[in-house]
Design a protein with these regions (language model features):
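Sec-dependent N-terminal signal peptides
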Residues: 1-22
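Low-complexity intrinsically disordered segments
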Residues: 11-14, 34, 64
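D/E-rich low-complexity acidic segments and tails
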Residues: 24, 34-40
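Signature of exported/secreted
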Residues: 24-28, 47-376
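Low-complexity, polybasic segments enriched for Lys interleaved with small residues
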Residues: 39, 44-45, 49
Length: 376
């Protein structure tokens, strides 16, 4: 961490020498005819020079050390791309994911468009060495899903206007609002531990107990950690110069849905004022679930599958804008395009499915909540 240094000034003293002054007095002549003789000159008694006090020299003023501002961000060392936190001072994020998916199954083309927006608050509550304890709250959620012409929508900021035909899905999103997690963050932004996962799953399954087994597999502790990755997982472990890169690999197991391994390559592209541009390239690898993975919680079972990225200059990459003064992400946008095929077992019948998917995720950060005022 950066240290504040206090300069200490020494005092210089001036020593003055005393000046001696000699004084001679005449001796009166003696009486009688005696020849006059000059009395020997008597030396004037030496007088000590008066003591002269050295002039007082005022010590130079030394400012008292400044008391650290409790509202100032905690220093993050020499790494300009490191996160900074201020105890009890929250910050807020809006994360919007837009997905366009086309699925072809049994000769039918099924289109699906969805947009999900999550409103988060983050409250740093304690620093423990190089670690920070941060409380994350889902302040609100908004979603629009259209599956083959059947729309579903939910907006926690305007629940009265929620529409669509699938109220079960709306109830699922409604349960998400207000959920809290306690994150333990390492110095490089890695989420070491998450508390609140069990309460989260319990809350989501209150209205549908059949989802409990599935969500316990999909929403593992590791999966919950990855929920915070778009926020904290972009900064390097060591100091980087402009044009230098660093990798980050994220593995995510989704139980009966298989697993993903995402490899991110970050590059410190440039610095403009307080804003650092970080370029991102994304590599994706999908692995279908193993044969021993239970799939009874789903209406189908994935027997095999291949999902790869589509080579496109405009996708599978993005940009993160990091504010080096405040020590946090200002904004980010990452686009991913993929295609593939899955072999499904549906009620004992093998079905081939092909799909393409475009996905874009945007994150914004602010000192104020992004949750809009509730509509009257």
């Amino acid at each position: 961490m950066r240290l504040r240094l206090l300069a200490v000034c020494g005092l210089a003293f001036i020593v003055l020498t005393a000046i001696a002054q000699e004084k001679k007095d005449p001796v009166p002549p003696a009486k009688g005819d005696a020849p006059k003789t000059e009395a020997p000159k008597a030396e004037a008694p030496k007088k000590d020079a008066p003591k002269v006090d050295a002039p007082k020299v005022d010590a130079p003023k030394v400012d008292a050390p400044k008391t650290p501002d409790p509202k100032a961000p905690a220093p993050a060392g020499d790494n300009p791309l490191a996160w900074k936190f201020t105890k009890d001072v929250p910050f807020y994020q809006e994360m919007t994911t837009t997905t366009t998916q086309n699925i072809k199954v049994q000769g039918l083309d099924v289109g699906q468009n969805q947009q999900q927006t999550f409103y988060f608050s983050f409250l740093p509550i304690k620093q423990d060495g190089d670690k920070w304890i941060v409380k994350q709250t889902i302040e609100g959620v908004k979603m629009k899903i259209d599956i083959a012409g059947s729309p579903v929508s939910y907006d926690s900021t305007n629940e009265a206007a929620a529409g669509g035909t699938n109220t079960a899905l709306s109830e699922f999103f409604k349960a998400i609002k207000g959920s809290q997690f306690t994150l333990t963050l390492l110095k490089d932004g890695t989420v070491e531990k998450v508390e609140g996962r069990d309460e989260f799953v319990k809350k989501l399954t209150q209205s549908n107990k059949q989802l409990e087994a599935l969500l316990n597999k999909i929403l593992s502790e590791e999966a919950i950690k990855q929920m915070a990755d778009p926020t904290f997982g972009v900064t390097p472990k060591e100091v980087k110069k402009e044009k230098e890169s660093w990798p980050r690999t994220v593995k995510l197991s989704l139980g009966p849905l298989g697993s993903y391994e995402n490899t991110y390559t970050f590059t410190y592209a440039k610095q403009t004022g307080d804003i650092a541009d970080i370029d991102v390239k994304v590599g994706l690898k999908y692995t279908p679930p193993g044969p021993d993975t239970a799939g009874e919680t789903l209406p189908f079972k994935i027997k095999a599958g291949t999902i790869t990225q589509v080579a496109d200059e405009k996708t599978n990459k993005g940009t993160v804008k990091f504010n080096t003064k405040s020590g946090r992400i200002e904004s980010s946008k990452i686009d991913i395009k993929m295609s593939g095929s899955l072999t499904l077992d549906i009620g004992g019948t093998t079905t081939e499915v092909t799909l393409t998917q475009d996905q874009s995720t945007e994150v914004k950060t602010s000192d104020k909540s992004f949750v809009p005022d509730k509509k009257q």
